[in-house]
Amino acid sequence: MIRTLAYEGDPHIGIFTRVLEDIAVVPPEASADYCAALKEALGVTLVKTHVQGSSIIGSLVSGNSRGAIVSGLAYPDEIRAIEEYREVMLLEGSMNAAGNVILANDQMAAVHPDMDNATIEQIHSVLGVPVIRLTLSGIKTVGMAGYATNRGILVHARSAGRELATLESTTDLPVGTGTINMGSGLVGTGLLANSTGYLAGIETSGFEMGRIADVFGFVEG
């Protein structure tokens, strides 16, 4: 089975696609081979849409199996496409790149530390999980500095012990550090995963792949 992937030659697949357990939101122009790899590795239903007229879906969408948090600048037809599968919350204001600022699964959500209380309460209501403010390796865009599934959470290799402890206090899932695409700590930029499987950016090394498999509980070979 394919374990590494590129989006139009770009290894940062997490910027262009958002997996919400049983669905994957992908740009309409994604290639047939790219879409086939997602379906084979992750067993997902594909939701083909832009967000804000853009293909950087992973940066603009977050969520879990209950709900989706989408940039407040998304167009009505884009919102409707996602609403067929999830309750949608629009993330308004200057901090609207939901995929960058929210790390979520079905147990928890971690958000940019400067996010306001009212928005956090909305996220809690839509996703149905406790929400914490967090940095990872001091990085506020936790949605790209980590990747959460219902099997485990992979975070930036230089995450501090206190950051890991805060995250571990919200979940009973394994939390581990790692890198993607030959040394990038921004693991969310180059990873797509769910309870079924995972795909990493095409530049990801064998060692990095092994770490991903370990944190998410997949046995290689």
From Swiss-Prot:
Keywords: Initiation factor, Protein biosynthesis. Signal peptide: none annotated. Transmembrane segments: none annotated. One of its GO terms (molecular function) is ribosome binding. It comes from the Archaea. PANTHER family: TRANSLATION INITIATION FACTOR 6. HAMAP family: eIF_6 (MF_00032). Binds to the 50S ribosomal subunit and prevents its association with the 30S ribosomal subunit to form the 70S initiation complex. Belongs to the eIF-6 family. NCBIfam families: eIF-6, PRK04046.2-4. This is Translation initiation factor 6. The lineage of its organism: Archaea, Methanobacteriati, Methanobacteriota, Stenosarchaea group, Methanomicrobia.
